[in-house]
């Protein structure tokens, strides 16, 4: 299974949710978490493995062609049982599209679950690997900015004809209700999460994620995927 996670707007916690979903899936099957967010500092920082040895995207620049998924997985740092393919904050560089396609295909053939932290701009531009995804999760706040962002994503999601769900973050004081966001964006509402102040306080550095609103959102997504927690 390949699962994409994308934010309807910046700062909604899409990378955090992607990481926690991957962590949960890794309890049931071999799992890799892949960083495709072009503007981020690296998922390895988010999950706290930035100092762990292993390959990042720049190390795979020559990996085009016939790539063996087992070889890639063996090179990657681990976050618990989950392999992590991240950008490198010290070596910011664009990934060659051909290399990205070959590496993702190899990983999808090797692991039981592949979780992609998608770049919102790449999705809108048609450069994200949506066709490879079995499901895409859109993360939004309960506000008009997220509605507009989700609507911008919809044409590409519709073209991919993949299953898609919506996770809405917000609280009782949110400008809109989660059902309003789902209705306006045309996406199925999978979960409503209250604002996680503890997560914000620790700068969205993700631990194993056993408790809290973000953890419950990840549990809800995994239930929707039907793999189990």
Residue ranges: model-predicted function:
Residues 19-27, 45, 152-155, 183:
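Short, well-ordered alpha-helices that flank and scaffold nucleotide-derived cofactor binding pockets
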Residues 27-28, 60, 141, 156-160, ...:
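Cytoplasmic membrane-interface segments at the C-terminal ends of transmembrane helices
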Residues 49-53, 156-157, 182-185, 207-211:
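Short, hinge-like loop/turn segments at secondary-structure boundaries
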Residues 1-31:
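Walker A (P-loop) phosphate-binding motif
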């Amino acid at each position: 299974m390949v699962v994409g996670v994308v934010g309807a707007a910046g700062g909604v916690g899409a990378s955090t949710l992607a990481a926690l979903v991957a962590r949960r899936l890794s309890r049931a099957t071999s799992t890799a978490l892949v960083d495709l967010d072009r503007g981020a500092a690296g998922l390895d920082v988010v999950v706290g493995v930035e100092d762990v040895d292993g390959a990042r995207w720049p190390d795979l620049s020559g990996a085009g062609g016939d790539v063996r998924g087992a070889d890639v997985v063996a090179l990657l740092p681990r976050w618990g049982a989950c392999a992590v393919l991240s950008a490198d904050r010290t070596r910011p560089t664009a990934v060659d599209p051909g290399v990205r396609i070959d590496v993702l295909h190899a990983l999808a053939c090797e692991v039981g679950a592949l979780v992609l932290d998608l770049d919102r701009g790449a999705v809108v531009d048609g450069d994200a690997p949506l066709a490879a995804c079995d499901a895409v999760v859109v993360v939004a706040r309960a506000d008009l900015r997220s509605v507009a962002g989700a609507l911008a994503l919809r044409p590409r999601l519709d073209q991919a004809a993949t299953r898609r769900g919506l996770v809405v973050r917000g609280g009782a004081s949110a400008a809109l209700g989660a059902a309003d966001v789902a209705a306006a964006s045309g996406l199925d509402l999978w979960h409503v999460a209250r604002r996680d102040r503890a997560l914000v306080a620790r700068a969205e550095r993700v631990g194993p994620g056993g408790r809290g609103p973000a953890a419950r959102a990840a549990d809800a997504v995994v239930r929707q995927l039907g793999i189990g927690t």
